[in-house]
């Protein structure tokens, strides 16, 4: 299995270094649910600004404040502790009376707004995230500038970030041990983290191998293509390649890579043979996913940061802004810009 740091680059390995997350204010994330609260219902959506707190800690504190069980507080996604983040929490509080959440106090945390909502906020139920990052001590401004220009046109690999695999790769290591021993894992959180890490690592491997080809955006017979921003896909045929290539070049269609698991992977013929060969050595992880009935799926191979802009504060400091759809990793964008340094270079967004 290819280590995350050794995955193939789309724009070549960066020539310079830089410091990511010198302080929490250098990594700002604003969650975009894509909808507004209903204004009624048994749930309460709470928009939180936090600095130095992880999501689960804040959710547990909110549950305690509302005198409800921790499982009654949900969120769409985990946000980094070592960052300034805005995100929504959802608490199930039936009844007509609205609690005064302005009285909720937690160090490093502030309630920005809250309102009633009809439905529980479930994991993954967000449109995306807006990021504002500051890279400091940049050693090669010209290289970073050119890479930003290139990313606007060609995007970046849609890799799962190193944080998906746990500190020091612990989640992936857990999955590998589980696959080798076939010992039942009772802990639901471990099961979820390990299976996710296994599938994500296989996806990354397929993308890394595809990037070694002359043109990663070249449609081949049997590729699974999806409309940009959509989840469903269809299979490319030889007769359609020219027209499909035009639509891929126009970013109307995206070439996808497999999230291996049980069932058909989605590609056929040449594309399927390539994907199978890319992960042929990882038989144990593939068998684990099939055994645990994790369904195969697809994910776009490339990621195009939206609303990408940047501003150099000086020759060694740049502020970068962009928006990413849910499930994408800001650190996979930064990886194509600089070789990051600092304690929090690969902490989760």
UniProtKB/Swiss-Prot annotation:
What is annotated as the active site? 80 (nucleophile)
Q: Name one Pfam family in it.
A: TruD
Q: Per its UniProt entry, which superkingdom is the organism in?
A: Bacteria
Report if keyword Isomerase is assigned: yes
Q: Give the GO terms filed under biological process for this record.
A: tRNA pseudouridine synthesis
Gene Ontology cellular component annotations, sorted alphabetically = cytosol
Annotated residues that bind substrate are located at: 27, 129, 329
The protein's matches in PROSITE patterns, at most eight in alphabetical order, are given as: TRUD, UPF0024
Report the sequence similarity comment from the record: Belongs to the pseudouridine synthase TruD family.
Q: What is this protein called?
A: tRNA pseudouridine synthase D
Q: Which organism is it from?
A: Shigella sonnei (strain Ss046)
What are the top taxonomic ranks of the organism?
Answer: Bacteria, Pseudomonadati, Pseudomonadota, Gammaproteobacteria, Enterobacterales
Gene field:
truD
